[in-house]
């Protein structure tokens, strides 16, 4: 009985540690600063998708931009309330407030979910011949967002993942909160659907 209990505890421990690493890949994690070659190269654009703690995502994107990681910012997201400002425009306004010139910001205002974020933003990427982007979203959402963007962009554009490590909904103590478990179960389920369902469903 003791061995079974120890095994169960070990499995839970590995799950708690492993889930954040799986859901939130960070390709820039080992990069101290932009470099001329490799994963740490400057990107053509920093793409930030709305949802969850959107302000935290904008802050992370703006920080990367100010540090010289990308040449422009692209914000993607429709209006949460169809009578109001789109998420993308609200994100743009916040970025300008944080000190970014409008000249370096583009918006995509029609995406209602992650699949549409990828589909609609990919058009802009293709039309402007971008070859390398940094994708920013919440840590729990990074894996699925990357899968959706990879599906629609293909091998022609390099996608560099960089999640917001911690925000109002997610932290290293995700397992201690109901919303943490809700996000994990939801994301793992949606990733499963991604592999078996038609495109554009989530």
Where are each of the predicted segments found?
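Hydrophobic, aromatic-rich alpha-helical transmembrane segments
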Residues: 1-2, 180
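Hydrophobic membrane-insertion alpha-helices, especially the h-region
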Residues: 3-19
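Juxtamembrane/interface motifs at transmembrane-helix termini
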Residues: 6, 125-128, 181
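A structural signal for short, hydrophobic/glycine-enriched beta-strand patches
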Residues: 18-176
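A transmembrane-helix-recognition feature enriched in membrane-embedded lipid enzymes
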Residues: 176-202
């Amino acid at each position: 009985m003791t061995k079974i209990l120890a095994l169960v505890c070990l499995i839970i421990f590995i799950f708690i540690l492993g889930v954040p690493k799986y859901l939130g890949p960070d390709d820039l994690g080992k990069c101290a600063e932009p470099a001329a070659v490799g994963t740490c190269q400057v990107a053509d654009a920093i793409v930030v998708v709305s949802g969850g703690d959107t302000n935290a995502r904008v802050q992370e994107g703006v920080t990367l931009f100010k540090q010289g990681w990308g040449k422009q910012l692209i914000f993607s997201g429709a209006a949460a309330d169809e009578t109001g400002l789109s998420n993308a425009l609200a994100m743009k306004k916040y970025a300008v407030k944080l000190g970014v010139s409008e000249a370096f910001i583009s918006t995509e205002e029609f995406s209602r979910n992650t699949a549409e974020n990828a589909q609609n933003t990919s058009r802009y990427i293709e039309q402007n011949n971008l070859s390398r982007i940094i994708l920013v979203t919440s840590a729990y959402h990074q894996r699925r967002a990357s899968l959706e963007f990879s599906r629609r962009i293909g091998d022609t554009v390099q996608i560099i993942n960089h999640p917001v490590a911690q925000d109002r909904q997610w932290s290293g103590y995700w397992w201690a909160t109901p919303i943490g478990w809700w996000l994990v179960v939801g994301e793992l389920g949606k990733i499963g659907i991604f592999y078996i369902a038609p495109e554009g469903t989530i």
